[in-house]
């Protein structure tokens, strides 16, 4: 399976004319999870932000994926935040994340 960034890849240019890329991932089947996890890690490694949607993943597996992504993001010097229930945003070290009042929704 080859990954096609064309449908899930965005350029963001709003603040200070700085651009960064965002990869949006939403695995629908359990068989896709390992593939999407590797794609998200590769994207972070090359300084792309990742939005990962856990909506169709059962809690125990979603928690393991979240732990893996959070650990890898931390190791690469990046940051993460929960946008809403089951939707997380991971950014590389080149992007500074600012969340209002540090209010983070619970995972589930």
UniProtKB/Swiss-Prot annotation:
Pfam families tied to this protein: SepF
Compartment(s) where it occurs, according to its Swiss-Prot or TrEMBL record: Plastid, Cyanelle
GO-annotated biological processes: cell division
Alphabetized InterPro entries for the sequence: Cell_div_SepF, Cell_div_SepF/SepF-rel, SepF-like_sf
Function: May act as a cell division protein.
Family stated for the protein in its record: Belongs to the SepF family.
Protein name: Cell division protein sepF homolog
Lineage: Eukaryota, Glaucocystophyceae, Cyanophoraceae, Cyanophora
């Amino acid at each position: 399976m080859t990954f096609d960034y064309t449908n899930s890849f965005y350029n963001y240019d709003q603040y200070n004319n700085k651009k960064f890329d965002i990869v949006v991932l939403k695995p629908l089947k359990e068989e896709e999870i390992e593939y999407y996890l590797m794609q998200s890690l590769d994207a972070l490694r090359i300084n792309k932000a990742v939005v990962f949607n856990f909506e169709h993943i059962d809690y125990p597996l979603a928690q393991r994926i979240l732990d893996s992504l959070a650990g890898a993001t931390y190791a690469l010097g990046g940051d993460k935040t929960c946008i809403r229930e089951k939707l997380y945003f991971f950014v590389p070290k080149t992007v500074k994340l600012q969340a209002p009042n540090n209010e983070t929704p619970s995972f589930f």
